[in-house]
From Swiss-Prot:
EC number of this enzyme: 3.4.21.92
Chief localisation class: cytoplasm
Organism from which the protein derives: Buchnera aphidicola subsp. Acyrthosiphon pisum (strain APS) (Acyrthosiphon pisum symbiotic bacterium)
Location in the cell: Cytoplasm
Keywords carried by this UniProt record: Cytoplasm, Hydrolase, Protease, Serine protease
Family listed: Belongs to the peptidase S14 family.
Reaction(s) the record says it catalyses: Hydrolysis of proteins to small peptides in the presence of ATP and magnesium. alpha-casein is the usual test substrate. In the absence of ATP, only oligopeptides shorter than five residues are hydrolyzed (such as succinyl-Leu-Tyr-|-NHMec, and Leu-Tyr-Leu-|-Tyr-Trp, in which cleavage of the -Tyr-|-Leu- and -Tyr-|-Trp bonds also occurs)
One Pfam family named in its UniProt record: CLP_protease
GO biological process: protein quality control for misfolded or incompletely synthesized proteins
Active site annotation, chain numbering: 112, 137
Assembly information from the UniProt record: Fourteen ClpP subunits assemble into 2 heptameric rings which stack back to back to give a disk-like structure with a central cavity, resembling the structure of eukaryotic proteasomes.
Gene Ontology cellular-component terms listed: cytoplasm; endopeptidase Clp complex
Classification via NCBIfam families: clpP, PRK00277.1, PRK12553.1
Lineage: Bacteria, Pseudomonadati, Pseudomonadota, Gammaproteobacteria, Enterobacterales
Protein's recorded name: ATP-dependent Clp protease proteolytic subunit
Length: 208
């Protein structure tokens, strides 16, 4: 029991630990957390479950980088199991709205909503690392309440399914019929399969 508590505490501390980077300047030193330092290089990370707070942070970073330089690409690194559809759609809409082209790179996994964000990057600038996995499926949802309310939510999730499949079809070039068929169950694709499907454009094995 004590070992489990120690192990859980270590896991928690690793999960919340953010490395710091120290840079030397003429006026002394300045320290950044690693993500802020990478943001200076126009790199944004989508990691973990997609939810409202995380999505708001991603949107804010994209808008900030657009204000800094509307002509320079933004690099979006994705390692996410997916999450809340409306949260993900706020990121998606912002990606399509801003002037800079957004290059998407999957490392680890891009599942569900994260897969849509991966494939919605600028054409020719969507990448996977060699051992990444992409998973597409239909929306998940559940609701408790009065029968009429359950019917309303059921209609809404079916409309959301149609919208997501239409977007996936647009970005991949696959037919709506094929997207509907493939997303009926969890559909896992390797990096190579993701290229053939049209989810990404290239596999990155080494930095050029």
């Amino acid at each position: 029991m004590l070992y489990d508590q120690i192990k859980n505490n270590k896991t928690s501390s690793y999960a919340t630990f953010i490395p710091m980077v120290v840079e030397q300047h003429s006026r002394g030193e300045r320290s950044y957390d690693i993500y802020s330092r990478l943001l200076k290089e126009r790199i944004i990370f989508i990691t973990g479950a997609i939810e409202d707070n995380m999505a708001n942070n991603i949107v804010a970073q994209i808008l900030f980088l657009e204000a800094e330089n509307p002509e320079k690409d933004i690099f979006l690194y994705i390692n996410s199991p997916g999450g809340i559809i409306t949260s993900g759609m706020s990121i998606y809409d912002t990606m399509q709205f801003v002037k800079p082209e957004i290059s998407t790179i999957c490392l680890g996994q891009a599942c569900s909503m994260a897969a849509l964000l991966l494939t919605s990057g600028a054409k020719g600038k969507r990448f996977c690392l060699p051992n990444s996995k992409v998973m597409i499926h239909q929306p998940l949802g559940g609701y408790q309440g009065q029968a009429s309310d359950i019917a309303i939510h059921a209609r809404e999730i079916m409309e959301m399914k149609k919208k997501l499949n239409k977007l996936m079809s647009f970005h991949t070039g696959q037919s709506i019929k094929k997207i509907n068929k493939d997303t009926e169950r969890d559909c896992f694709l390797s990096a190579n399969q993701s290229i053939k499907y049209g989810l990404i454009d290239f596999i990155l094995s080494q930095r050029q």
